[in-house]
């Protein structure tokens, strides 16, 4: 598998990941937060997390569009979207509510993954 194939596969995987994350946030926020290592959320934390569902559905749609069309502007849009997520999970990891061992490190890795995807999708846009 070459770099382009790996990036295209990653893009397809992210469609499912973002749909799952958005669906979990919308329909089962406590369970989804628990899967991420979060303590039992307060009602306001549940609603704040639930309001992120449209964001992740938008990410899934952008990934799906790039998978279907593959135009340079689609890849640039994904690079930009993933770039906006570089620090969000790192900032979120500072919450004391992430109690499960490894959950904070996983959020830092999510930031690194977003950086890698942003760079990779930008590369695809220029290819």
List each language-model region with its residue ranges:
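Short amphipathic, positively biased membrane-proximal segments
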Residues: 1-127
């Amino acid at each position: 598998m070459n770099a382009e194939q790996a990036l295209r596969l990653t893009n397809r995987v992210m469609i499912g990941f973002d749909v799952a994350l958005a669906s979990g946030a919308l329909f089962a926020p406590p369970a989804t937060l628990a899967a991420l290592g979060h303590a039992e959320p307060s009602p306001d934390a549940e609603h704040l997390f639930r309001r992120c569902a449209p964001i992740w559905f938008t990410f899934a749609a952008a990934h799906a569009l790039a998978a279907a069309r593959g135009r340079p502007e689609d890849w640039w849009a994904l690079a930009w979207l993933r770039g906006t997520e570089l620090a969000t999970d790192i900032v979120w990891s500072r919450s004391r509510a992430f109690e499960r061992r490894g959950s904070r490190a996983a959020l830092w890795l999510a930031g690194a993954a977003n950086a890698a995807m942003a760079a990779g999708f930008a590369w695809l846009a220029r290819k």
